[in-house]
Design a protein with these regions (language model features):
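Substrate-binding clefts and catalytic carboxylate motifs of secreted carbohydrate-active enzymes
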Residues: 8, 147, 158-161, 173, ...
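Active-site-adjacent substrate/metal-binding segments within catalytic domains
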Residues: 23-51, 58-63, 68-75, 81-84, ...
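Substrate-binding/catalytic cleft of secreted carbohydrate-active enzymes
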Residues: 343-361, 366-541, 579, 597, ...
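Extended carbohydrate-recognition surfaces in non-catalytic/accessory domains of CAZymes
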Residues: 1-63, 136-165, 169-172, 253-260, ...
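Intrinsically disordered, low-complexity Pro/Gly/Ser/Thr-rich segments with frequent PxxP/GP/PP motifs
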Residues: 219-226, 670-705, 766-790
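Beta-strand-rich binding/interaction modules
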Residues: 60, 73-75, 188-216, 648-686, ...
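Accessory beta-strand-rich segments of carbohydrate-active enzymes
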Residues: 12, 35, 40-172, 199, ...
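Terminal connector regions
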Residues: 248-261, 272, 699-735, 789-812
Length: 812
């Protein structure tokens, strides 16, 4: 039995044990295995605090914002509560339990693994379910973030801890909730109404930056309000409402007319105050029968939206570690490449207030799954009641956010039952959990958030096959979990592709963290030294940090279809990330050429630990090659080139735009050896918002496919296509490159030969690139944006590694 050790709150026990040297860092090497004994342990946290009953406030509450997960709370040696839900706060009235002076607080956590197994055994006996029933293990019976039990991109670290803040609240009366509703008139006027849940015997006075109301109820009539839009469609205008809770004997009629003076008067007498930010907007989910099936299309403020974004997983294996700063960095990275929507995946969390506030500010719509994923769940009795309570708490917390666009019952549970995942013989006799998604959650939303769209599962389409593509949304995994070659993305018939992805290696910086580069000796059992890190891609540690369940040789073979065989870990990082980029480019261009697809949400934006995965940005914050390509793929104006046996076609498409796209476009064949133009066509064009057009057809006869690049240009828009596989190309040798850094965060680079997929890396970790992984079809000077100190750079393209010559003067 361990003695008492120092602990951090908020925190998780694994983090404390690492800090105290009891276990090794589970993110390094293969240490995950050696840490899993902690999952089966009971853990206690204790502290003591001074309390002086000097306050005039008659009520005192102890509030835990997050407890992970099954625990009992003791105050001064007496159990005062039990809790079993990571997603719901716990608030306890301790007005009569606190003592003057020193108070002792203890929280005792049971093992979520052992509790889940025990409940499962009882439930299976009651239901008469065989032990071999698939997708119904211990995680289904504990309301805890499901990814912590391990996923195909994350470790199994079923931790415990006080994962969100704890506070002692003293009050006379409180505003518990403010719900702001919007009524939109046909002429564009909007009425805001604030409905407050507050203690009896008080009055609520609400101020907004658009108007004033004395008393609870109507806030403001706005004849021409500034609306909130997702990124790319308009501004993210937010209005702040401030609610004041005042005694019943307060004379509201005496409030000054001047707003500042009135608020100062209220602040002096208020028993409580709460601020709420709202954005004026409408969001609808259109699902209409048509000749293709049934649509799945978001409409914001009456305008059709092509949703462009990604799936979001928790940003750390131990969610107590996720900071507002880290959230901002990831979310700004999403906006930087033109995303307008994120899907908060059902195996994770209801995210923190910080997350939704940042999405409001950045214009990122949120598709919010309720936290159920890839499993069956009990759906009646105590479990159903707990889910209802959890949902009520979180719907109230999140419903005022303009970024919140959709509630979804679960991730893939419906299609899991339809397709008998785990085998027909191991499928349960009914869809366990269905009552939650069809009854419990819709009823909560009807009561608390009736205006926001809801779907019971994702994907959700046809009655027999919810993942058919022609109806509803689709998770298109036929490539990664099926045919392997990314060219098959062109077979998807999705109306809305809410999950699809292609995995790749994390960055060398992430690998350095895995191999614990700070140590001095070679790693036991690893074929690398810490100072060189030229690891074999088949090294056991490298393989351990691949949870894709694909079989590592298959993973390698997917890249080998197109790229040379990697000889070093650095080769694998480079080639696998290019292959991921190619895959997502193929898919996104296909979806945006489609006449009926209205959304693309890539799996996945982020990682929770250093791993090879589908992420666009790894755990070290390093964008992969695909991330840089997304700026082009998510732009309103998109060019794409498709190849047939005898010709290439140039396609144009326009989405999320307020005006037509007009101009002159060219499609050229360029020599990869010299950069000279071999053949070219051009045309005038005009494309309306939502329109797709084929504008040019270039003959390919007589071209050397191994040494030709197709280049399309129109203003700032461009597209490239190779006629041969990258591993078959004839390229100019890797010549030195001249680079210069200016004070505005711009790197100028001069190339003397064409370069395909030039990637700059920073061995010192001092540079963050905003532009990278570029193709330069002709010799010249290119400007790339960066942040940080421009030193210690390395460069490689498909031709090989390029020496860099740093110049003190600008190149242009």
């Amino acid at each position: 039995m361990l003695e008492w050790l120092p602990a951090r709150v908020p925190g998780h026990v694994h983090l404390d044990l690492v800090e105290q040297g009891v276990i090794a860092d589970p993110f390094e090497r293969m240490n995950e295995l050696g840490c899993q004994w902690v999952d089966d342990q009971e853990v206690s946290y204790r502290t003591q605090f001074e309390f002086s009953p000097d306050s005039a406030a008659p009520h005192r509450a102890l509030r835990f914002e997050g407890l992970d997960t099954v625990c009992q709370v003791f105050l001064n040696g007496e159990q005062i509560a039990a809790h079993e839900n990571m997603f719901a706060p716990l608030e306890l009235d301790v007005s009569e339990r606190l003592v003057s002076g020193l108070n002792r607080l203890e929280v005792r956590f049971d093992s979520a693994v052992r509790v889940g197994k025990a409940i499962r055994a009882r439930y299976f006996a009651e239901q008469g379910l065989p032990e071999t029933t698939a997708r119904f293990d211990e995680r289904s019976f504990v309301r805890k973030a499901q990814y912590m039990y391990g996923w195909d991109w994350g470790p199994r670290l079923v931790s415990a801890g006080i994962w969100r803040p704890v506070s002692l609240i003293e009050y006379a009366a409180r505003i518990r909730d403010v719900h702001v509703t919007q009524s939109h008139a046909p002429n564009g006027a909007v009425r805001l109404d604030a409905h407050s849940d507050a203690d009896a015997g008080v009055l609520v006075h609400v101020f907004s930056d658009a108007g004033v109301c004395v008393g609870d109820g109507q806030v403001a009539d706005l004849p021409k309000p500034e609306r909130w839009y997702p990124h790319g469609l308009g501004p993210q205008t937010l209005h702040t409402l401030t609610s004041y809770l005042c005694p019943l004997d307060f004379d509201a009629a005496s409030l000054p007319v001047d707003r500042s003076a009135a608020e100062a008067r209220l602040a002096a007498v208020a028993l409580d105050r709460r601020t709420t930010r709202v954005g004026i907007r409408t969001v609808r989910l259109l699902q209409k029968e048509d000749s293709f099936g049934r649509s799945f299309e978001f409409e914001v403020n009456g305008e059709s939206l092509f949703a462009l974004g990604a799936n979001w997983i928790p940003g750390h294996s131990f969610p107590s570690r996720i900071s507002r700063r880290a959230l901002r960095e990831r979310l700004e990275s999403a906006r930087e490449v033109g995303m307008n929507m994120l899907r908060v995946w059902g195996g994770g969390l209801y995210e923190s207030d910080d997350f939704y506030e940042l999405c409001d500010e950045l214009g990122l719509l949120v598709w919010q799954d309720f936290p159920f994923a890839c499993a069956y769940y009990p759906d009646t009795g105590e479990f159903g009641a707990a889910v209802r309570e959890e949902a009520c708490v979180n719907v109230r917390r999140l419903r005022n956010h303009p970024s919140l666009a959709l509630w979804c019952g679960n991730n893939e549970n419906e299609v899991m039952f339809q397709q008998s995942w785990g085998g027909e013989e191991h499928r349960p006799p009914r869809y366990y959990g269905e009552h939650l998604y069809d009854q419990v959650l819709p009823q909560v939303l009807l009561e608390l958030d009736p205006e926001r769209p809801y779907v019971p599962s994702s994907p959700h389409g046809g009655e027999k096959d919810g993942n058919s593509g022609g109806v509803g949304d689709q998770h298109y995994w036929d490539v990664w979990h099926g045919r392997g070659d990314w060219q098959h993305y062109r077979d998807s018939s999705a109306r809305f592709s809410s999950e699809y992805g292609f995995a790749s290696s994390c960055s060398m910086r992430a690998w350095r963290s895995v191999f614990a580069e700070h140590a001095r000796d070679a790693l036991p059992g690893a074929s690398v030294t810490l100072h060189d890190l030229r690891a074999s891609v088949r090294d056991p540690i490298v393989r351990w940090h691949d949870k894709t369940a694909k079989g590592y040789e298959v993973f390698l073979s997917y890249a080998a279809l197109h790229y040379p065989e990697p000889q070093t870990l650095e080769d694998w990082v480079y080639y696998s990330q290019l292959n991921q980029r190619d895959a997502l480019r193929c898919a996104l261009e296909h979806y945006r050429r489609s006449a009926f697809c209205k959304g693309s949400l890539i799996w996945q934006l982020n990682d929770c630990w250093p791993v090879q995965s589908w992420a666009l940005i790894d755990s070290e914050g390093q964008p992969k090659s695909a991330w840089f390509e997304l700026r082009r793929l998510h732009a309103p104006e998109l060019m794409s080139i498709t190849l047939a046996a005898a010709h290439a076609e140039l396609h144009l498409g326009l989405d999320n735009a307020r005006s037509d796209w007009r101009g002159n476009v060219s499609l050229s064949a360029v020599s990869l050896l010299t950069g000279s133009e071999v053949r070219s066509l051009n045309a005038e064009f005009s494309v309306a918002n939502g329109e797709r057009r084929n504008v040019l057809r270039l003959p390919l006869e007589g071209l050397n496919q191994r040494s030709t690049l197709l280049v399309a240009n129109c203003g700032s828009s461009s597209a490239y296509a190779l006629l041969a596989e990258p591993k078959e190309l004839e390229l100019a040798s890797a010549e030195p490159l001249s680079v210069s850094f200016d004070t505005d965060g711009v790197l100028e680079l001069r190339n003397t030969t064409p370069l395909i997929d030039l990637v700059l890396t920073d061995a010192r970790g001092t540079v963050a690139f905003l532009d990278n992984c570029v193709t330069l079809p002709r010799p010249g000077v290119t400007r790339l944006r960066y942040r940080g100190q421009g030193h210690g750079l390395e460069a490689r393209s498909l031709a090989g590694r390029h020496p860099l010559r740093a110049l003190a003067t600008r190149l242009i």
